[in-house]
From Swiss-Prot:
GO biological process: DNA repair; DNA replication
Keyword Zinc in annotation: yes
Molecular-function annotations in GO: DNA ligase (NAD+) activity; metal ion binding
Protein name: DNA ligase
Source organism of this protein record: Latilactobacillus sakei subsp. sakei (strain 23K)
């Protein structure tokens, strides 16, 4: 292999001809690898041909074609993802979790149809739903599901995935859907690299895949080794298939990567056999699955059965029960949180569970540790809550060592040595030392967070260094930091120093509610902080108020009032507030008052609004605040009194109810237009 002569010795015509041969050859190899699961050549052979093509295209840029394999790795950094409308909505899928529920689904369908039913049964890939559009055989657009109606255009990132063909085997126009996923090996490799670089590992392959597809730089997505299976034809004028199994065959013939495991089942006994087969071997697969999907095989019957507002009536997902694994507890660690809560974590022999290695599991609090009677050297059963969070199900008492002793709950803080307290009506142990280093780190992280003082660039890693070098001791010290101070931090150069100092300086002007929330006063969340700041208008007035005065604020009760009075009565807190004022932090409310919001000419003024789904541009709290500033009343449930529903991604029952009541639905893409009205 390798080019027959030096690249500069080729004419443009020769180079164009050879490049096209290489493209065709690479396309065949790629299809065999991804579609037929039968590689024709070793990986290194593919790589050498790929490099030959790269050399030719680099020497003769005019011969590059849009569907060339070399164009799958995008070099374009997108300014942002544009929203796209799904002409045919990407609905959710109903799920069941037991054989009885699955049988009930089957009986319901058979009762409502006059014909015999067979199912196409497929593995439920644990990934991210995608929609692909091809025109005359060429890939032109790819999108996420979004909220089912509005998705995001992620075409450039999807072009980096080898399993998604740029060009089909026939010049047809078609819309298809499938699942993008990260193979287990790629996930393990990615997390290993992230941990080596000091980054937090992804929780699971699905999150990793979703995060990769949302990268604005397609090169980042390309490096993540994503793959995809296609399983649905949405629109295709030339389709001859009459069943789902035939449709999968058509997809494979067109060059799509189709999962080869699907089978047609005539009855529930055959379905159950398929479930048992893959429930027992799921960890042997190169990709993650979390169940199987049953689809009525007859496409005409699918159309006859139709959909509910949210899900198709002709398909269902059977979710596998959580897997369990057995391991031994070697240590119990205690960590201190922002509010002084001390939490136990079991450190165990590493064990494979649901496709990942688990060596730690939270025990949540001292009471749970006592109730479960977890001890050192105990053998325990683990499962993953929601297939994500490791939890101890039970202690295997038959394997407990004969000399085992009940675990002693600590009485002093593992960080500062201060006595721990168990407050009335709480399950948590607490360290109440305000100068506890572990608490200080968490408090500073909270203070700088997005919903509090919003100091961009001030994260846990920087805060840890600032504390270790004794450059700060409390939140007021942040506003005394200099460029010389920050220059002492590891890998902190001039640009980073200036950016952080500017962010700290800008936070001085925040309205009072951000400061109140950022201080981390017990029971005072973002909503309570806003109500208090708007009512009292300045910090001095709040600090001077007693419990009776504070509870006159709308929705503020005695628990919050007691917490505030206790907090501000502390002499150290009073000193800290004086220091914050001295360093120029704003201590007054500068937000929109209710009276101002009531006179707003905004579209939302006077309207009752409900939020649902995952929002991309805002946190839930930020959008709620913005709507209230525009005169809206934001509530948590949909009713006939609701004037509008703002729906983000993965909207659930609230969206379905709003649609049934004909309540206007506003998607996030259109929200700015409404706010501008």
């Amino acid at each position: 292999m390798g080019l027959a002569k030096l690249v500069e010795d080729y004419t443009q015509s020769e180079a164009a001809s050879l490049a096209q041969q290489l493209r065709d050859q690479l396309a065949d190899y790629s299809q065999a690898y991804y579609t037929q699961d039968a590689p024709l050549v070793e990986d290194h052979v593919y790589d050498e041909l790929y490099r030959d093509l790269e050399q030719l295209e680099a020497a003769f840029p005019v011969i590059v074609t849009n569907d060339s394999p070399t164009q799958k790795v995008g070099g374009q950094v997108l300014p942002g993802f544009t929203k796209v409308t799904h002409e045919i909505p990407m609905l959710s899928m109903g799920d069941v979790f037991s054989e009885a529920e699955l049988a009930a689904f089957d009986q319901r369908l058979r009762k409502n149809t006059a014909t015999e039913i067979e199912y196409n049964v497929e593995l439920k890939i644990d990934g991210l739903a995608i929609d692909l559009i091809y025109e005359k055989g060429r890939f032109v657009r790819g999108a996420t599901r979004g909220n089912g109606t509005i998705g995001e255009d992620i075409t450039q990132n999807l072009k980096t995935i080898k399993a998604i063909p740029q060009k089909l085997t026939r010049p047809v126009s078609i819309e298809v859907r499938g699942e993008c996923y990260m193979p287990k090996a790629a996930f393990a490799d990615l997390n290993q690299k992230r941990e080596a670089e000091g980054q937090a590992p992804f929780a699971n392959p699905r999150n990793a895949a979703a995060g990769s597809l949302r990268q604005l730089d397609a090169k980042v997505a390309a490096a993540r080794q994503l793959s995809a299976f296609i399983y649905t034809i949405v629109t295709f004028d030339d389709v001859q298939a009459t069943t789902q199994s035939e449709a999968l065959h058509v997809l494979a013939e067109l060059g799509f990567n189709v999962n080869p495991t699907s089978v047609v089942c005539q009855n529930m006994a055959e379905v159950q056999a398929f479930i048992e087969q893959y429930q027992g071997t799921r960890n042997d697969l190169a990709y993650g699955i979390d169940g199987v999907v049953l689809k009525v095989n007859d496409l005409a019957l699918q159309r006859q059965l139709g959909n509910t507002v949210k899900v198709p009536r002709w398909e269902i997902a059977y979710k596998f029960p959580p897997e369990e694994a057995e391991t031994v507890i070697r240590e119990i660690e205690w960590t201190v949180g922002r509010t002084g809560v001390v939490t136990p974590t079991a450190v165990m022999d590493p064990v494979q569970l649901a496709g990942t290695t688990v060596a730690r599991a939270s025990l949540h609090n001292a009471d749970m540790l006592r109730d479960k009677d977890v001890r050192l050297l105990d053998t325990v059963l683990l499962h993953k809550a929601g297939d994500i969070i490791p939890e101890i199900s039970q202690v295997v008492l038959a394997k407990r060592p004969s000399d085992s002793q009940a675990y002693g709950i600590p009485t002093t803080c593992p960080s500062c040595g201060h006595d721990l307290v168990h407050l009335d009506e709480e399950v948590a142990l607490r360290c109440i030392n305000p100068m506890c280093p572990a608490q200080m780190k968490e408090q500073l992280t909270h203070f700088a967070s997005r919903n509090a003082m919003n100091i961009d660039g001030l994260g846990p890693r920087i805060i840890t260094q600032l504390l270790e070098k004794e450059l700060i001791h409390d939140v007021a010290d942040l506003y005394r930091l200099t460029a010389d101070d920050l220059a002492q931090l590891d890998k902190f150069k001039e640009k980073s120093i200036n950016n952080l100092l500017n962010a700290i300086d800008a936070s001085r002007q925040n309205s009072l509610e951000r400061l109140l929330f950022g201080l981390g006063i017990r029971h005072v969340g973002a909503k309570a902080a806003r109500l208090l700041a708007e009512h009292f208008q300045n910090l001095a007035a709040l600090m001077a108020s007693d419990q009776e005065t504070i509870i006159t604020v709308d929705t503020i009760g005695t628990i919050i009032a007691d917490s505030l009075v206790t907090y501000f009565a502390d002499s150290q807190v009073q000193t800290l507030m004086a220091e914050l004022e001295a360093v120029g932090v704003n201590l007054t409310y500068t937000g929109v008052t209710k009276a101002q919001a009531a006179t707003s000419d905004s579209y939302f003024n006077g309207k009752t609004v409900v939020l649902t789904g995952k929002l991309e541009q805002y946190t839930r709290g930020e959008l709620k605040q913005l709507l209230e500033d525009n005169g809206a009343k934001v509530t948590g449930s949909v009713s006939k009194k609701t004037d509008a529903l703002i729906a983000g991604q993965d909207a659930g029952s609230k969206l379905e109810k709003a649609q049934s009541l004909a309540i206007p639905i506003i998607n996030e893409a259109d929200l700015d237009n409404y706010l501008a009205q």
